[in-house]
């Protein structure tokens, strides 16, 4: 995206422009529920609303870092097919993206960069080389991560802490046993930024692995609305 061209749209009447994608040259990147209070209306003219996966991961990682001190880690996304993908093989600048949408594809993702833009204290801790599994489903994504944390904790205490610290508007915890575990379609039109699967949360000494469910379209749109309503006041 050419930010210089976007800035040409600014005028006396149009004082701020919000972009629904990651844009490193934007004046400010916001994930609602993480850093919207740092927005300065007269200074931040071009505002990026990050990405759907950034909005899913950042609120959770903010709490984990504040409570348990993230040392380093990796993030991976499991993401449905995009509209740009075709049902049959065809040309594409990335060969794997040119393959039919019924395939499982491994591609690079900017989720780590999106997180670091709003949580700069995680720079150098979350690996920038993140990967995405593009899978042949229509809706609902998952963020999988492995983190090394400084403060050791049991799984039960970790879940209790996350549940206590989270804002229920942005985050949720899916409790239950193996027999009650939910699947992706159960989260369609769930407005929360992400929902932690307690059953799929594991802790081994100082290593934490987790799964976050999120409706990558509906929940992201709700956060876009929240952010614009808050920042345009």
Name the predicted role of every residue range.
Residues 128, 215-217, 230:
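Mobile acidic interaction elements
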Residues 50-51, 104-106, 214:
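Hydrophobic alpha-helical scaffolding
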Residues 72, 77-208:
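C-terminal substrate-binding/catalytic lobe of Rossmann-fold NAD(P)-dependent oxidoreductases
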Residues 134-136, 213-220:
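Glycine-rich phosphate/pyrophosphate-binding beta-alpha loops
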Residues 1-87, 91-93, 97, 202, ...:
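N-terminal Rossmann-like NAD(P) cofactor-binding subdomain of oxidoreductases
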Residues 44-48, 207-212:
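Short pre-catalytic strand/loop immediately N-terminal to key active-site residues, enriched for Gly-Thr
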Residues 55, 151-153, 218-219:
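A generic structural signal for alpha-helix starts
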Residues 149, 228-233:
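Short, hydrophobic alpha-helical segments
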